[in-house]
Amino acid sequence: PARACIQTGQYATVNGSYRNGIPLTKSVKPLAEHFKDAGYRTGYIGKWHLAQTGHGAVNEEDRGGYRDWLAANVLEFTSHDYHTALYNEDNAEVELPGYRSDAMVDAGIRYINEHKEEPFFLFMSFIEPHHQNHVDDYPAPDGYRERYANRWVPPDLAALGGSTQRHLGGYYGMVKRLDEGLGRITDALKSLQLDENTIVVFFSDHGCHFKTRNAEYKRSCHESSLRVPCMFHGGPFAGGGRRDELVSLIDLPPTLLDVAGIDVPDSMHGQSLLSRVERTGADWPDHVYFETSEAETGRGVRTERWKYHVRAPEDAAVVDGKSDVYEESFLYDLQADPYELANLVGIESYGGIRSGLREKLMERLAFVGETPEIAPPPGTRGGQRMVADSEVASLGFSHNIPGRSR
């Protein structure tokens, strides 16, 4: 679903790809076609996951308007750490040598060099640090897992367990190698004298909570899966710095078009971040809206301080990814509890906070075409155990956990 949001600029329940296995809609002009119509050469390398043609080759009509193609629909099933199989414009299999992210970086640099004389829009979709599905592992390049074994563990993962101890070293190793590869891409742009006229955007479609929040590793409302890195380099973003405004993946498509001087269509749901960098334009929203799927049908809003989430009960009628009723499931005070260890949703003293956040959520739901009932939390909360005060204290926290007395 996140991939469809990026290619259309619309929330998943509007563009229709609200879960895996639903192809990218053809009723919305995709991002690549906006760039193509503006005179850009468009290319895609890596994982697509927006077609129904199986794991490998993707038919031309299902490629979202990209002209040049070297990709697989579900890359984790056509490759592993030292074997990378992608498919070209003719749907012929192409094997790339080296560690997987290195092989894709090499392909990206070749593409940049081949098209350096014309404006281009290249979308590279790495799979690292996604886990390797069929072996339930995070295969770092040789030596990298060992380098990052027994390193720092985020407090939420340390408290909640999951598969963290088994997988975190490999995950860190994959992140490190990918970071080195991105450095090679920026070096290539500099050597080709393209760095001052090229914008590089780095982001992820989701994070990873290592099975601490539910039986999976990414499908939840928690920061470890919901919050992702987002960095811009070059052009109006060359000055450096960090901004703290709340933004969403839905803001990236209008930003890319805006920076390229291409009109942003009204059909896109996000806002260009260029105004934030240039400190112009209207006030920025004080919250972001998000949707969760597959492990649950959920909706939520996040402000600077609060996280509020609802999900459809198991017996709800879910049609086209939407429910007629949701139950309040999580409320977190991110200021007092940044690692989301104390769920406040059922505590009466936070009723006013819930009410205000519920109002924001209902406005967002109306925008995407939902008018559900939001019910109070059920008597028993599932999906996350309560963490004892002693466990939190052992992690080095000295503050009281909100909503609990000692």
Locations of regions flagged by a protein language model:
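Formylglycine-dependent sulfatase
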Residues: 1-330, 338-359, 363-366, 372-373, ...
